[in-house]
């Protein structure tokens, strides 16, 4: 574990514990390599009253490399969230920036959920899930074509 990696994650973990964004709370963060974060559906959204869990896995290249972020347990039914928990969101892959933080990623995912008007899976859900099996979403080549949901 490099010192930059550890310092950055310790700072972000402390910030997330002491000043969490609305509807976001850390449930597991004792291990710097893997965190579990609870996400609650926002008031007025189609996910209001629902609770989800995100898993963040960090490599020693963080923050230069993006974390692996997936929903664990039962993922929300959403046009950009696959039934295996993989999330089609460009900032997790091609548009990652070291300026992004765990909190900002959580807020982006929460915003994506809050803006959704229909609970449906991606049209290629079955095909995608059977093709990727147990691969990390970071090993998948993503094509981003719909920013409206």
From Swiss-Prot:
GO cellular component, one term: nucleus
Metabolic or biological pathway, per its Swiss-Prot or TrEMBL entry: Protein modification; protein ubiquitination
Job description of the protein: Catalyzes the covalent attachment of ubiquitin to other proteins.
Keyword Nucleotide-binding: yes
InterPro entries xref list: Ub_conjugating_enzyme, UBQ-conjugat_E2_core, UBQ-conjugating_enzyme/RWD
Gene this chain is encoded by: ube2w
Enzyme Commission number(s): 2.3.2.23, 2.3.2.25
Pfam families (UniProt xref): UQ_con (PF00179)
Active site (UniProt): 88
GO BP of this protein: proteasome-mediated ubiquitin-dependent protein catabolic process; protein polyubiquitination
Family note: Belongs to the ubiquitin-conjugating enzyme family.
Domain UBC core intervals: 4-149
Keywords from the named record: ATP-binding, Nucleotide-binding, Transferase, Ubl conjugation pathway
Protein's UniProt name: Probable ubiquitin-conjugating enzyme E2 W
Catalysed conversion reaction: S-ubiquitinyl-[E1 ubiquitin-activating enzyme]-L-cysteine + [E2 ubiquitin-conjugating enzyme]-L-cysteine = [E1 ubiquitin-activating enzyme]-L-cysteine + S-ubiquitinyl-[E2 ubiquitin-conjugating enzyme]-L-cysteine; S-ubiquitinyl-[E1 ubiquitin-activating enzyme]-L-cysteine + [acceptor protein]-N-terminal-amino acid = [E1 ubiquitin-activating enzyme]-L-cysteine + N-terminal-ubiquitinyl-[acceptor protein]
The keyword Transferase appears for this protein: yes
Gene Ontology terms, MF aspect: ATP binding; ubiquitin conjugating enzyme activity
């Amino acid at each position: 574990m490099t010192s930059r990696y550890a310092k950055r994650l310790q700072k972000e973990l402390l910030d997330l514990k002491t000043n969490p964004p609305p509807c976001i709370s850390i449930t597991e963060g004792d291990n710097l390599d893997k965190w579990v974060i609870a996400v609650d559906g926002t008031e007025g959204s189609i996910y209001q009253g629902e609770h989800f869990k995100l898993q963040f896995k960090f490599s020693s290249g963080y923050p230069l490399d993006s974390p692996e972020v997936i929903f664990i347990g039962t993922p929300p039914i959403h046009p950009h969230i696959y039934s295996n928990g993989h999330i089609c969101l460009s900032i997790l892959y091609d548009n990652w920036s070291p300026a992004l933080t765990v909190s900002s990623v959580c807020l982006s995912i929460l915003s994506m959920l809050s803006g959704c008007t229909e609970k449906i899976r991606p049209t290629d859900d079955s095909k995608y899930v059977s093709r990727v099996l147990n691969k990390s979403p970071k090993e998948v080549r993503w094509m981003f074509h719909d920013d409206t949901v």
